[in-house]
Amino acid sequence: MVPGSEGPARAGGLVADVVFVIEGTANLGPYFEELRKHYLLPAIEYFNGGPPAETDFGGDYGGTQYSLVVFNTVDCAPESYVQCHAPTSSAYEFVTWLDGIKFMGGGGESCSLIAEGLSTALQLFDDFKKMREQIGQTHRVCLLICNSPPYLLPAVESTTYSGCTTESLVQKIGERGIHFSIVSPRKLPALRLLFEKAAPPALLEPLQQPADVSQDPRHMVLVRGLVLPVGGSSTSGSLQTKQAVPLPPAPASAATLSAAPPQALPPVPPQYQVPGNLSAAQVAAQNAVEAAKSQKAGLGPRFSPINPLQQAAPGVGPPFSQAPAPPLAPVPPGAPKPPPASQPSLVSTVAPGPVLAAPAQPGAPSLAGTVTPGGVNGPSAAQLGGPALGGQQSVSNKLLAWSGVLEWQEKPKPASVDANTKLTRSLPCQVYVNHGENLKTEQWPQKLIMQLIPQQLLTTLGPLFRNSRMVQFHFTNKDLESLKGLYRIMGNGFAGCVHFPHTAPCEVRVLMLLYSSKKKIFMGLIPYDQSGFVNGIRQVITNHKQVQQQKLEQQRGMGAQQAPPVLGPILEEQARPPQNLLQLRAPQPQPQGAVGASAATGQPQPQGATQAPTGAPQGPPGAAPGPPPSGPILRPQNPGANPQLRSLLLNPAPPQTGVPPPQASLHHLQPPGAPTLLPPHQSMGQPQLGPQLLHPPPAQSWPTQLPQRAPLPGQMLLSGGPRGPVPQPGLQPSVMEDDILMDLI
């Protein structure tokens, strides 16, 4: 665990939303390594509080979110103009994304599609705002790295900002309080004009940092909202971070190349100096020639072989030879686990084929778990039955510190069961520590009780997470059902809070159990400040209750005054007693949660269920079709604050005849007429494409409306609508949060 060190001039506990917008053409390629070393890595260290490390699991819930947008030129057709990575809270993974950019194309163009990149970045900030509702305002920074002026063309791929020019986009960035910065290898007047137009209305800080921030007199570095080192280059820790990123191996020779990075990337910092007789442009050109030769020789179209040139200059080679790995198939039991950097992380705004969702880090709960051919997130039964579940095999070089049982409660799978009953699960587990570490576990009880907390509520506890020690949990796969349930819950946006009883005379009072989907291991964080951590958890739960109460009051006030005619009956239905709600539930069709359950269990799912028909808007059952509803979209009510709604959720109506009960334990039925924030059958990790379902469909069964088709792998990432919607990771319905928090409050 890396101790909680603060970066240069970095305020403690800074929660930031950072988006890097990078030109992915060959015009920037020869200069990117120098910009990365002198400006990008120091900026990441500033937001991360120190050099990014692969073992820093505390950063998974530290609050700061990073996202990457790569834009091209018009000659990239028919490919999408922009590639967008889903947000991550791991600075180390963000560095691997930077190293995986393929700088290609744009040789015949003097401009680049900066407007497309900035419009996608604005959509990301809109999504960040929805994710940050629990903690309020954050420090937002947009960093543009390019080497060409913008086209005089408006953005076309973005749905929200289509038609906006580059200048209007940077003005929107400044008006929304987003700090806009530019890094370019040469001084371009057009880019400086963009920086000036992005100045906030009331500029309270200097226009730019001192001139000596640039490490090269030819560079143009205009920054707001962050501090870069003045003079000198980046620290050795940043270079070691670069060294620790392995090259992604080709799938055909994964076992051979997995052992190659230690030899191909020797841990000697002086080797990051490029030989004097090779310029960066020559290195890029030779790599391109090698890549072309490998394509002709049939060695794979996307990867260049590891050659002596890369061994001589590893600091320059990876940015030009590294590429995102192709979609991965589920790893069979016992197969060697590829290195973390070989897993795909690029989520394009328009997927050209069946692309599988990326295994995400715990900080981005939306894309957790391995994507199986059925489209179900989470490890398969065959993988769970494998020897020690892949990543858990790494406990062989650790010391056993404690052995006992972990117990937790979850909702039973059939939704028809009384919601007041909880299903108690337990698994034998062992706690391991590294050699040389001393963990006093003599006074630990034999049974640890774990409660589940939505990880969104933990974003403000970043400093406490960093100031903690790390242990590894290993679970015995004797009970496959319990083990699958643990993987499903921990991989879908929840963290485990393990409480130690006050009767036990041990030093530890609370322990956080986190799941790393990339390494397939469970990590335990033991904060050094135990009392501060307990108080922090109590504070975030209290704040969550207050925020939900305020939202409920605002919804009632808004619904009584400004609700459109179509939404009026909905608010009236929500205000009626529970028995009326139960009567209204009867004539409705199959519950939406059952549709999600059919997708989760591999049953046929009707196509087009993600988005409503565009021909006629759907209203409540029995209401005539009217104009599309306008006004604010209401969030689901807080069942803890509304006793009537809570009693309804805790005592659902009996299942309808001919309708299978929902099988997914994490899907909850919503009150009738309440608009859904996300389509109920859509898992939290899948992007939201197309219009949202604002009303339940008419009283007809699904098979009579749409023909049934088996779900295809990756179908949730494909959409026939306009290109450009950005995934909304980490967005969870407040109904689920409150349901879990009932055990804590």
Swiss-Prot record:
Annotated stretches, region: Disordered: 233-266, 299-374, 584-738
Chain spans, region Interaction with VP16: 389-543
Pro residues: bias regions: 324-342, 618-631, 652-663
Localization per Swiss-Prot or TrEMBL: Nucleus
Major localisation: nucleus
Keywords assigned: Activator, Methylation, Nucleus, Transcription, Transcription regulation
Chain ranges for the short sequence motif LXXLL motif as given in the UniProt record: 645-649
Region (Interaction with the Mediator complex): 1-226
Family, similarity comment: Belongs to the Mediator complex subunit 25 family.
Function of the protein: Component of the Mediator complex, a coactivator involved in the regulated transcription of nearly all RNA polymerase II-dependent genes. Mediator functions as a bridge to convey information from gene-specific regulatory proteins to the basal RNA polymerase II transcription machinery. Mediator is recruited to promoters by direct interactions with regulatory proteins and serves as a scaffold for the assembly of a functional preinitiation complex with RNA polymerase II and the general transcription factors. Required for RARA/RXRA-mediated transcription.
Protein name as catalogued: Mediator of RNA polymerase II transcription subunit 25
Source organism per UniProt: Mus musculus (Mouse)
Gene that encodes the chain: Med25
